[in-house]
C-alpha cells in the first residue's frame, strides 16, 4: 500500500531529540517498520497547492497520516482525487482539517481515526500555563528583563491573581474537564462550563463546576474564558465580534482548541480596545500561521496581553511518544484487517460517523 505521512520539518532538532516523532526526519518512528512490510512510504512537509508533494501523491494513496500541528487539509477536491484512499489517521487529536461531512455524504468507504487521549494532559497543562502567563503579565516582564530593563510598576499595573476569579470553559470534555480539575487548586471564585451535555453529578461535584446553558450568559460572568471544544460547523467562528460584546470587559481569553473557532480580526480588535485584557493560546488558522496574522502583533493598551505560541501544546515529547505509538496501533489493526480499533479513536468508520464530536450521518 502507499502510505503518505505529512509532518513538519525539524532539521537539527530531530537529531537533538529522537523522540521528536512528529517531524519528517523521525516520521513517527514508523518509516522503517512500514518499508519492511513492503509499503510505499512518502514522507513530506509539502502540503499546499497543486504542485505539492501531497497533491502529487494523493491520487494513489491508500493511507494518509497527518498531525494537528502541521495539518494536511483534506478537502472535497482532494477526497475526490484520492480514488484509492481507505484510511486517514490523525497522529494526535482533532480531525477538523478533514472534510468529514463530505466523506460521510459521498458514500466513500474511508475511515478516519485519531489517537484520542494522547495529548489531553499536555493540552490541559498548557491551558493553565497560558492563563497564568496572561493574568500574571509574564511575557512583558520576561521581555523587560531580556532587554536589560527593570520597571516593576510597568508590569504590576496589569498583573493579577487567578485566585478569586470566575473561570469558564467552553467545552468540558476530555481536555476541558482536566482543565477544571487543575484549576481547583487555585481556589477560583467559581468554575463554569458550557457544553452540549451535562457532566455527571459526581464529576460536577468533584470540581465544583456549574453548567451554564447559554454561552452569552457564560462569558458575561467570567473573568477568564478557556476554549476546549472541537472545531466543527457549529463552532467555527463561534467567538466573533457579537459574542465578544457579551464578555466581561477586561476578561482574558485562552484558546488551545482550534484557531478557526475564533474570528482572528475580531479577537485582535477586542484586545486592542480593552474589551479583552488579553488573548493567548497556540492554535491558528491556517497553520503554519502567515507572518501577517493579526495574533502575532496584537496588544492591549499597555503593549501586553499577547500570550500566543506556535501550536505545540499537544506536541510535547511525552505526547509525541503516545500519539506515535497510537498511530502504529491503528495501522497494525488496518493492515492485518482486524479493524479492532479503540472505539474512542474512531471518527468515521467506512464513511459512517462514530462520534458526536464532529457531526452525524447524512
From Swiss-Prot:
Which Gene Ontology terms cover its molecular function? formate dehydrogenase (NAD+) activity; NAD binding; oxidoreductase activity, acting on the CH-OH group of donors, NAD or NADP as acceptor
Any one GO CC term of the record: cytosol
Q: What InterPro entries does UniProt report for this protein, alphabetically?
A: D-isomer_2_OHA_DH_cat_dom (IPR006139), D-isomer_DH_CS (IPR029753), D-isomer_DH_CS1 (IPR029752), D-isomer_DH_NAD-bd (IPR006140), FDH_NAD-dep (IPR033689), NAD(P)-bd_dom_sf (IPR036291)
What are the binding positions for NAD(+) in this chain?
174-175, 195, 230-234, 256, 282, 311-314, 357
Q: Which UniProt keywords apply?
A: Cytoplasm, NAD, Oxidoreductase
- Provide the site residues for: Important for catalytic activity: 258, 311
* Residues reported to bind substrate: 93, 119
Q: Which reaction does it catalyse?
A: formate + NAD(+) = CO2 + NADH
Q: Which Gene3D superfamilies match?
A: NAD(P)-binding Rossmann-like Domain (3.40.50.720)
Q: What is its main location?
A: cytoplasm
Q: Which GO terms describe its biological process?
A: formate catabolic process
Pfam families reported in the protein's UniProt record: 2-Hacid_dh (PF00389), 2-Hacid_dh_C (PF02826)
Instruction: Give its E.C. classification number.
Output: 1.17.1.9
The places in or outside the cell where this protein is found are: Cytoplasm
Q: Which domain of life is it from?
A: Eukaryota
Task: Please tell me whether the keyword Ribosomal protein is annotated for this protein.
Answer: no
**Protein role:** Catalyzes the NAD(+)-dependent oxidation of formate to carbon dioxide. Formate oxidation is the final step in the methanol oxidation pathway in methylotrophic microorganisms. Has a role in the detoxification of exogenous formate in non-methylotrophic organisms.
Q: Which family does it belong to?
A: Belongs to the D-isomer specific 2-hydroxyacid dehydrogenase family. FDH subfamily.
Q: How does it assemble?
A: Homodimer.
In Swiss-Prot or TrEMBL terms, this protein is called Formate dehydrogenase
What's the gene?
FMDH
Amino acid at each position: 500500500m502507499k502510505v503518505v505521512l505529512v509532518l513538519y520539518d525539524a532539521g537539527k532538532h530531530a537529531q537533538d531529540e529522537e523522540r521528536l516523532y512528529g517531524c519528517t526526519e523521525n516520521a513517527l518512528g514508523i518509516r522503517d517498520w512500514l518499508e519492511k512490510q513492503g509499503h510505499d512510504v512518502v514522507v513530506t512537509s509539502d502540503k499546499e497547492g497543486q504542485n505539492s508533494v501531497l497533491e502529487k501523491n494523493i491520487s494513489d494513496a491508500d493511507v494518509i497520516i497527518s498531525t494537528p500541528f502541521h495539518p494536511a487539509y483534506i478537502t472535497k477536491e482532494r477526497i475526490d482525487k484520492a480514488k484509492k484512499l481507505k484510511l486517514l489517521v490523525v497522529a494526535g487529536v482533532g480531525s477538523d482539517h478533514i472534510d468529514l461531512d463530505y466523506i460521510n455524504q459521498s458514500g466513500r468507504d474511508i475511515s478516519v481515526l485519531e489517537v484520542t487521549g494522547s495529548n489531553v494532559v499536555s493540552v490541559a497543562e498548557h491551558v493553565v500555563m497560558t492563563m497564568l502567563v496572561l493574568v500574571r503579565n509574564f511575557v512583558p516582564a520576561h521581555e523587560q528583563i531580556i532587554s536589560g530593563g527593570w520597571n516593576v510598576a510597568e508590569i504590576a499595573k496589569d498583573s493579577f491573581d487567578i485566585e478569586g476569579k470566575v473561570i469558564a470553559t467552553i467545552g468540558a470534555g476530555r481536555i476541558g474537564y482536566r482543565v477544571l480539575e487543575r484549576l481547583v487548586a487555585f481556589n477560583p471564585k467559581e468554575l463554569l462550563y458550557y457544553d452540549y451535555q451535562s457532566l455527571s453529578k459526581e464529576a460536577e461535584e468533584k470540581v465544583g463546576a456549574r453548567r451554564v446553558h447559554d454561552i452569552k450568559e457564560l462569558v458575561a460572568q467570567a473573568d477568564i474564558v478557556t476554549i476546549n471544544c472541537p472545531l466543527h460547523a457549529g463552532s467555527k467562528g463561534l467567538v466573533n465580534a457579537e459574542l465578544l460584546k457579551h464578555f466581561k470587559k477586561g476578561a482574558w481569553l485562552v484558546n488551545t482548541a482550534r484557531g478557526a473557532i475564533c474570528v482572528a480580526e475580531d479577537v485582535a480588535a477586542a484586545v486592542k480596545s480593552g474589551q479583552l485584557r488579553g488573548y493567548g493560546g497556540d492554535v491558528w488558522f491556517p497553520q503554519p500561521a502567515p507572518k501577517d496574522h493579526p495574533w502575532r502583533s496584537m496588544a492591549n493598551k499597555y503593549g501586553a496581553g499577547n500570550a500566543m505560541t506556535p501550536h505545540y501544546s499537544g506536541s510535547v515529547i511525552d505526547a509525541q511518544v503516545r500519539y506515535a505509538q497510537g498511530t502504529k496501533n491503528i495501522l497494525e489493526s488496518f493492515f492485518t484487517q482486524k479493524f479492532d480499533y479503540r472505539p474512542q479513536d474512531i471518527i468515521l468508520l467506512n464513511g459512517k460517523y462514530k462520534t458526536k464530536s464532529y457531526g452525524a450521518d447524512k
